[in-house]
Amino acid sequence: MSDTVPTSALRLHSFRALQPGPRLIVTGAVHGNETCGSRAIERLVGELDRGELVLARGCLTLLPITNPLAYRRGQRMGERNLNRNLYPNPLPQDYEDHIANVLCPLLAQHDVLLDLHSFHSAGEPFVMLGPKDNTDELEPFSHAAQEEALALALGPRRIVEGWLPTYAQGVKSRLARTSVADRARLLSVDPRYGVGTTEYMRSQGGYGVTLECGQHDDPQAPEVGWRAIRNTLAMLQMVDAP
């Protein structure tokens, strides 16, 4: 996508208001060929830098390019899918492990995550929502009401629920169809492999949603992402009403 994007560091934009408030992080280009989030975030950075938008409360972190290697190549992944098996790794094996070792602590420092993506096929934008409040082992959670309010505020009408339980059920089905002798050759048989940005955020006591802003090349997708960021800031009362 761009030969000028360095792959050895993450470029963050951090804004801290003098008044206390929520700690929000917005991420783009977790997958390198999904650039609408990057463009939406850069647009917002420009507005903040020019004083057209003023952060009144809280802390805002903007990460336009979360996977620089994938972004630089214009591909979904650098060496693997960053949005799977997202945990800190004391013995990093690939580029995305190194990203995770920076990204995971960064997520843990925030209360709310908005993760901007796009998709391959034609279709309308949609929001991916996490589980209901629960104390289950797979994905315990206690901020369902706040997360649903965030999802409803973003703009898109379509909301999809239950990614991690669906993934875990798929793992169970694959194992049931596979002989014991062949199971060792299966990849991704641990349900925790389905953990990405929002799942990790919930595991650290926060909450977050994934917004699929539209098809990769839809000219409206960056607008959907930008509007969602503005709506999030307003809903969290991090900016004053116009």
Per-region residue spans from a language model:
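Structured catalytic-domain cores with a bias toward divalent-metal coordination
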Residues: 1-242
